[in-house]
């Protein structure tokens, strides 16, 4: 039972749960960006450069023979993937930049010193009284 309890404690830690949520949201965000690039950005871009469908751009290295498919370099799909990456990287950069700005604002905000406890206040008063007594005794 010890291993099971240790795993349970590990799995419910904030960092592990936060990481899992981040991975799930990141995967969903990646799908959204892929659709945005493939369905929204690339068609008008292809139209502007002469009606080219980027996903069909490829160099055939060896033609198909019978049941053997053609060997191609699908550089159009690669271009779409690069654009996906650039958009995701930019979105992550902007998110990290916003988080860092919030952290800097929190760090700059002045913190009020904690109110001393009654015991600390009493000890401070005793210390001050002893200092004044010692100063009065010295010639």
Curated annotation (Swiss-Prot):
InterPro entries: Mechanosensitive_channel_CS, MS_channel, MSC/AndL, MscL_channel
Subcellular location: Cell inner membrane
A single cellular component GO annotation: plasma membrane
UniProt keyword annotation of Transmembrane present: yes
UniProt function note: Channel that opens in response to stretch forces in the membrane lipid bilayer. May participate in the regulation of osmotic pressure changes within the cell.
Keyword Cell inner membrane: yes
Protein name (record): Large-conductance mechanosensitive channel
GO MF terms held by the record: mechanosensitive monoatomic ion channel activity
UniProt source species: Pseudomonas putida (strain ATCC 700007 / DSM 6899 / JCM 31910 / BCRC 17059 / LMG 24140 / F1)
Subunit structure: Homopentamer.
PANTHER family noted in UniProt: LARGE-CONDUCTANCE MECHANOSENSITIVE CHANNEL, MECHANOSENSITIVE CHANNEL MSCL
Membrane topology summary: Multi-pass membrane protein
Residues that span the membrane, as ranges: 9-29, 79-99
